[in-house]
Amino acid sequence: MAGGRYRAGVQQDRRTPAPAWRVTSGEPDPGTVERLLRSLPDWFGIESAVEGYVAAAARMPAYLAWPADASASANASEPTRTSQPPGISETAGTSEPANPSQPAGASEPADASQPAGALLAARHYPGAAEIYLMAVDPAWHRRGAGRALVAALEADLMADGVEFLQVKTLGPGYQDAGYERTRRFYAAVGFQPLEEIDGLWPGNPCLIMIKSLRGPRP
């Protein structure tokens, strides 16, 4: 997992001006992950699942999305890089809804110096990775934090030769409005549904979505 990285990109909401986002990666941050998960009971409402994600967050490097104009920085000495993420969240995924044309669902948080979103990624093989977890504070939904996190991860993975990225989320076999938005978000950032399977999460269908990180072939 890449560490100590920085990017900034401007995300444009058609109705509500979106902030620029600064994405950092490096050290585990279980405290931030727990705060974000507990702000999203409609997606992360099972206590044992929250505890499991927080335990994983204690050992996995975290990508964090910060409002770029926040007064506090995660690490002012980090090397910087800039990118313009392409215009576009839950279990092994994210909680950020997909449609940036809708106004933000909640007012901007008073303390913009805290990370608005977090992403954890797993490398299963040299050429394949997974979004293990992504969560965005509901006050920042539809403001571009989720897409900035995905873009930062993809840039690092492609630089390291990774060809495929997957995410697992609740499948359409279980009707849930929140997870329907999650699936739309992943489709909007380029993921394709591969297979819905039973048994991985007892009583809940798991949808595997994948994305190729390879550029167009000559």
In which residue ranges do the predicted regions lie?
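Short glycine/proline-centered loop/turn elements that form peptide/ligand docking sites
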Residues: 179-182, 196-205
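Conserved acetyl-CoA-binding loop of GNAT-fold acetyltransferases
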Residues: 183-195
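Conserved GNAT acetyl-CoA-binding A-motif
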Residues: 157-178
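Conserved acetyl-CoA-binding loop-helix of GNAT-fold acetyltransferases
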Residues: 142-159, 180-181, 188
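A short, internal acetyl-CoA/4′-phosphopantetheine-binding micro-motif in the GNAT/acyltransferase core
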Residues: 134-142, 171-173
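Acetyl-CoA-dependent GNAT
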Residues: 16-88, 101, 109-133, 137, ...
